[in-house]
């Protein structure tokens, strides 16, 4: 499968995402973030809601020409992982979140070759995902790589070794 074929499939999926779905995903984020400090909670919800809206729009409008082929074994493993997460969703809001996250993470990982969390994403302690040239650095990858439910093992970023 080519990256362009995958992009076309993702565009079709993205066209089925409506503002109501993004709002439902936002409600799930609010529920999921309830244990964060209030300031971080607000930033977390706003950042992810904005990212969902922007990324779905980006997918729908992506006119780039991608020349590569998709790692189909990696994609299958990734989809199996996402299917497992979706099957464990407890609410309709969580299912909306999983549906949107699935489209976006497949797009950024297998078409764009970018990290799951966009450059600039802030983690506790103020550390951020950053880019130098074509390399993406994550401040928490090594600590989160084995966390159940985390997408870190599929992410193209590497651990930021400037962070201890």
UniProtKB/Swiss-Prot annotation:
Q: What is this protein called?
A: UPF0305 protein MTH_812
Family annotation (InterPro entries):
DUF2115
NCBIfam families for this protein: PRK01022.2-1
Question: What Pfam family does this protein match (any one)?
Answer: DUF2115
Which superkingdom is the protein from?
Archaea
Q: Which family does it belong to?
A: Belongs to the UPF0305 family.
């Amino acid at each position: 499968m080519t990256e362009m074929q995958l992009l076309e499939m993702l565009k079709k999926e993205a066209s089925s995402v409506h503002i109501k779905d993004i709002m439902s995903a936002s409600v799930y984020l609010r529920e999921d973030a309830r244990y964060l400090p209030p300031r971080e909670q607000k930033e977390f919800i706003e950042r992810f809601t904005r990212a969902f809206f922007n990324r779905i729009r980006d997918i729908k409008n992506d006119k780039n020409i991608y020349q590569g082929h998709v790692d189909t074994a990696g994609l299958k493993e990734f989809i199996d992982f996402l299917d497992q997460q979706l099957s464990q969703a407890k609410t309709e809001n969580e299912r909306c979140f999983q549906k949107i996250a699935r489209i976006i993470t497949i797009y950024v990982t297998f078409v764009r070759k970018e990290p799951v969390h966009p450059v600039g994403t802030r983690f506790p302690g103020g550390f951020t995902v950053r880019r130098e040239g074509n390399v993406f650095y994550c401040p928490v990858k090594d600590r989160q790589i084995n966390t159940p439910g985390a997408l870190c093992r599929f992410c193209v970023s590497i651990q930021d070794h400037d962070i201890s």
